[in-house]
Design a protein with these regions (language model features):
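Soluble N-terminal domains of membrane-associated systems
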Residues: 1-94
Length: 94
């Protein structure tokens, strides 16, 4: 059984199993690796966290439901892979 971890995401409280938390942290780090502009990155990460929180609220049946790695994989599929963020940055900067 995975350990359950309390996670605060975009000002909202969630219970994550350990594998889900690690998967989400890796996703965030991959996004961050594509950007050098700190102010843009900070704004982007705030928006990404808020959107992920919205998606998780749609997924969970109640506030005590544990978020699993499958939930995070579904969210990432909706959000898109991190390399898509780099393509967006290149288009907006040219």
């Amino acid at each position: 059984m995975n350990t359950t971890i309390n996670v605060n995401l975009a000002g909202q409280h969630y219970y994550f199993d350990q594998a889900a938390k690690v998967k989400l942290e890796i996703y965030f780090e991959e996004i961050k690796s594509y950007f050098t502009d700190e102010s843009f990155l900070q704004e982007l990460m705030t928006d990404v966290e808020a959107r992920i929180a919205e998606l998780l609220n749609d997924i969970r049946l109640d506030s005590n439901q544990v978020i699993t790695i499958q939930h995070i994989e579904n969210v990432i599929q909706i959000m898109c892979e991190p390399n898509s963020f780099k393509i967006y940055e290149e288009k907006t900067q040219s």
